Amino acid sequence: MYIEIIDIYAREVLDSRGNPTVEVEVMLEDGSVGRAIVPSGASTGKFEALELRDKDSKRYGGKGVLKAIENVNEKIAPKLLGLNAYEQVSIDKTLLEIDGTENKSNIGANAILGVSMAVSRAVANSLQLPLYKYLGGVNAKVLPVPLMNVINGGAHADNNLDIQEFMIVPAGAPSFREALRYGAETFHALKRILKEAGHVTAVGDEGGFAPNLQNNEEAIQVLIRAIEKAGYVPGKDIYIALDVAASEFYNGETGKYFIDGTEKTSDELIEYYESLINKYPIISIEDPFDQEDWDSYRKFNEKVGKKVQIVGDDLYVTNVKRLEKGIELKATNSILIKLNQIGSVTETLNAIELAKTNNMTNVISHRSGETEDTFIADLAVATNAGQIKTGSLSRSERIAKYNQLLRIEEELGDAAEYKGIKAFYSIDR
């Protein structure tokens, strides 16, 4: 099969935070067009592929992406025009060769990813296939369990909570549609509880609330109350997940973590997590330690890895080399997948495949600076990942992904599978 790329064009658009980002359009010889917009993170791992920004203080506070746009239009396009769009692996390889650096710092991961995603979409449109079916083939059928970030802290909020995300996980629902309902009803119950307690209910970057509470544990207790108020059973219908983002409160000089107003060693932090796990229906903990604290990950996984999903985000940055190290050390039993951490569709699919082969779960994820692009919804179904993180139950750039998943579930009909608790296959539940 052969279809030529005849045009590639990039432009500067805005993300959900009002910051510039890259949008790319790819046209094929039959007139099919694929468009993709690249997201952007707030708490970024130090090993992520480089997002190229202009650093021109006169435009967008230095956050413009005109250099990345120019790289697409003037460096990438001439090399890709005339190539066969069906050969995604070869195209992504060419993109990496054009850049020539380990972390994509030459032409920018945002430039490369925009093109990589747009090529996938263009081909799916040309074949008149849904994107999930083009990427995943006939076996793409698993709707993901959503990990819904309804209370924000850390780098995502201006409040006193250290943990970055407190999530509800409707793993007890019978279908994705019902899971979304469980989540939405709990979100509204949570809003009422916070309002009655005199907290501000404005939402943060990912659509969650950012109240000032006594400590991190109180946030979990409030979530439990919201689940019950919505008429659900914590630990049966809906579970709790945390994204600690511990690199954000780790002191590299002392080797200690500052959480809940005190400094803790990594062993004390493990004890703290264990006490929470024993008290509350916590099913998943992401980034519990600093991105270079491999030893603490290994210890923690050895202790609780049979009963709680331990997710590496900043630890792995969707990078196969770092994931291989994690597998060797038995550092975690799960990986967070973010397209823009690594910067191409092929490399993302390689990371997902490697994790699955080693009985690790994959959690497909958005970024805090999102857009209306729904690529990750299709990616989750394409890879049968079984889990997705795409924010709270408010803000259109988050809801866009949930709505796309509803459409996919409807389209799949009886073939659609919602694994629920079985999506957490790396733990004993």
Swiss-Prot record:
Superkingdom field: Bacteria
GO function terms (MF aspect): magnesium ion binding; phosphopyruvate hydratase activity
Catalytic activity: (2R)-2-phosphoglycerate = phosphoenolpyruvate + H2O
Its EC number(s): 4.2.1.11
Active site feature: 206 (proton donor), 338 (proton acceptor)
Function, in words: Catalyzes the reversible conversion of 2-phosphoglycerate (2-PG) into phosphoenolpyruvate (PEP). It is essential for the degradation of carbohydrates via glycolysis.
HAMAP family noted in UniProt: Enolase
The protein's name in its UniProt record: Enolase
